[in-house]
Amino acid sequence: MGAAAAEADRTLFVGNLETKVTEELLFELFHQAGPVIKVKIPKDKDGKPKQFAFVNFKHEVSVPYAMNLLNGIKLYGRPIKIQFRSGSSHAPQDVSLSYPQHHVGNSSPTSTSPSRYERTMDNMTSSAQIIQRSFSSPENFQRQAVMNSALRQMSYGGKFGSSPLDQSGFSPSVQSHSHSFNQSSSSQWRQGTPSSQRKVRMNSYPYLADRHYSREQRYTDHGSDHHYRGKRDDFFYEDRNHDDWSHDYDNRRDSSRDGKWRSSRH
């Protein structure tokens, strides 16, 4: 390494100087970073100082330290710009180290963020298509209407007895009308659906869910259950009375026939 190259490594270029800045001022300023050998402000042909200067340090380690410490400081309201002198070994090394780090730091988010955005948009598009397919079929709407009407009639009409107004606020006549309409629509739907879908619908019928209730849940509401059992017992009682009446009628008819035959014989 020659003397000129060693001197370039220990020298800084200071630009954007005010005309009032002197060599003594720069000497005192840069002496904070390390011992300074000399400071030189070049002059033009007219003898006026130029707007840049060269600061020569005694030690090479003071050069990067002075650049980090004093770069951008204002002298007479104007910030100074410190650079490595041309021919210095610090200048290409600093540029080669700082530029790839800056480039890599800025390129990595831009390279990953579009792919992440595209994956997010693809997931949103696929989910929207699935939702659209599930709700766009008219059979799903008709099936939902039939299931809702059957569930309402089984829960309020059959289990809790007949009432003038159920909890939904409709009268029995309106319910019967809606029930007939739902039966017609369900029969049309049953004709158009294959046997596999019909089995799925029979398995998902609402009244099958009542079989899974526990014994405690089944007997919690004593009033409604008692009323339901009373109506069921009345039906069996009427059925038994009807069977007894028919049996008595048959016996009387047979006895009358026997009497007629006996009267005709005698």
Curated annotation (Swiss-Prot):
GO biological process, one term: snRNA catabolic process
GO cellular component: nucleoplasm; nucleus
Tissue spec: Ubiquitous.
PANTHER family linked: RNA BINDING MOTIF RBM PROTEIN -RELATED, RNA-BINDING PROTEIN 7
Record PTM N-acetylglycine, positions in chain: G2
Tagged with keyword Ribonucleoprotein: no
Domain comment as written in the entry: The RRM domain mediates RNA binding; the RNA must have four nucleotides for efficient binding. Mediates the interaction of NEXT complex with promoter upstream transcripts (PROMPTs) and potentially aberrant forms of other non coding RNAs, such as snRNAs. The RRM domain exhibits specificity for polyuridine sequences.
Impact noted for substituting P79R: Found in a patient with a form of spinal muscular atrophy; uncertain significance
UniProt function note: RNA-binding subunit of the trimeric nuclear exosome targeting (NEXT) complex, a complex that functions as an RNA exosome cofactor that directs a subset of non-coding short-lived RNAs for exosomal degradation. NEXT is involved in surveillance and turnover of aberrant transcripts and non-coding RNAs. Binds preferentially polyuridine sequences and associates with newly synthesized RNAs, including pre-mRNAs and short-lived exosome substrates such as promoter upstream transcripts (PROMPTs), enhancer RNAs (eRNAs), and 3'-extended products from small nuclear RNAs (snRNAs).
Biased composition annotated in UniProt, kind: Polar residues: 90-115
Gene3D superfamilies linked to this entry: 3.30.70.330
One GO MF term attached to the UniProt entry: snRNA binding
Region (Disordered): 90-118, 162-266
Reported impact of S136A: Impairs phosphorylation. Impairs phosphorylation. Prevents PROMPTs accumulation to >50%
Compartments where found: Nucleus, Nucleoplasm; Nucleus
Post-translational modification, as annotated: Phosphorylated at Ser-136 by MAPK14/p38-alpha-activated MAPKAPK2/MK2; this phosphorylation is stress-dependent; this phosphorylation decreases its RNA-binding capacity therefore affecting RNA nuclear exosome-mediated degradation. This phosphorylation mediates YWHAE and YWHAZ interactions.
Chief place of localization: nucleus
Omega-N-methylarginine: residues carrying this PTM: R152
UniProt KW keywords: Acetylation, Meiosis, Methylation, Nucleus, Phosphoprotein, RNA-binding
Ranges of biased composition (kind: Basic and acidic residues): 209-266
Species annotation: Homo sapiens (Human)
Protein name: RNA-binding protein 7
Modified residues (Phosphoserine): S136, S137, S204
